[in-house]
Amino acid sequence: MNVLRKIVKKCRDEDTQKPSPVSAPPYDDDLWLPPPEYVPLKELTSKKNMRNFCVNGEVKACSPNGYSFRILRHILRSFNEIYSGNHRMVGLVKVVVGLALSGAPVPEGMNWVYKLRRTLIFQWADSRGPLEGEELEYSQEITWDDDTEFVGLQIRVSARQCHIQGRIWCINTNSRACQLWSDMSLQTQRSEEDKDSSLLLE
């Protein structure tokens, strides 16, 4: 048991560095490659409460014995209760976490690291969402620990408003990202102006 505790401690404390400040990625940056079911859209016509954000997102899944997405989804179902960041940006964080986890992970010791660095376009309904010019630095660890296994999620999201053109994606409703957003109870409604885009309600 002591050995397991040491492993878990090492796993949690392996990387204590703060994420680097958000900077705009080059246009050809492919740190995150979307799965095949993501289809690029030409443009977003609506200008209603629309903002571009330069985003750095990282989700580090840590487990000495491996993990399954069933457990990750179970952990994320309690996201609203445990989220400790700026609540005006909780919708943005959910989108970034879902996109990051739907990409390809990179092994790092006992961890699997999912990273996302994009310029993303977000639309909020009415007066919801972050204030003009508001920035986010969010970091949190969520753990699942029972008699049989330990899984830790280290989530980091940095976001600041920017004026660089973002990439727009239409996502298949059966994609992994949509499953994760459903688990996290992401609140959206279809945009009246753009049939392929949604407005965030949080």
UniProtKB/Swiss-Prot annotation:
Region (Essential for glycoprotein binding): 115-151
Subcellular location(s) of the protein: Virion membrane; Host endomembrane system; Host cytoplasm
Keyword terms: Host cytoplasm, Host membrane, Host-virus interaction, Membrane, Phosphoprotein, Viral budding, Viral budding via the host ESCRT complexes, Viral envelope protein, Viral matrix protein, Viral release from host cell, Virion
GO cellular component: host cell cytoplasm; host cell endomembrane system; membrane; viral envelope; virion membrane
Pfam family for this entry, one: Rhabdo_M2
Protein's GO biological process: viral budding via host ESCRT complex
Entries under InterPro entries matching the protein: Rhabdo_M (IPR006870), Rhabdovirus_M_sf (IPR038617)
GO MF terms, alphabetically ordered: structural constituent of virion
Membrane topology: Peripheral membrane protein
Motif extent (PPXY motif): 35-38
Major subcellular location class: virion
UniProt-annotated site: Involved in the inhibition of stress granules formation and contributes therefore to virulence, residues: V95
Disulfide-bond pairs as recorded: none
Highest taxon of source: Viruses
Further facts: Most abundant protein in the virion.
Primary role: Plays a major role in assembly, budding and uncoating of virion after membrane fusion. Completely covers the ribonucleoprotein coil and keep it in condensed bullet-shaped form. Inhibits viral transcription and stimulates replication. Plays a major role in early induction of TRAIL-mediated apoptosis in infected neurons. Inhibits the integrated stress response (ISR) in the infected cell by blocking the formation of stress granules.
Family, as annotated: Belongs to the lyssavirus matrix protein family.
Note on domains (UniProt): Late-budding domains (L domains) are short sequence motifs essential for viral particle budding. They recruit proteins of the host ESCRT machinery (Endosomal Sorting Complex Required for Transport) or ESCRT-associated proteins. Matrix protein contains one L domain: a PPXY motif which potentially interacts with the WW domain 3 of NEDD4 E3 ubiquitin ligase (Potential).
Assembly, per entry: Homomultimer. Interacts with nucleoprotein and with the cytoplasmic domain of glycoprotein. Interacts with host ATP6V1A; this interaction plays an important role in virion uncoating after viral entry.
Descriptive protein name: Matrix protein
UniProt organism field: Rabies virus (strain China/MRV)
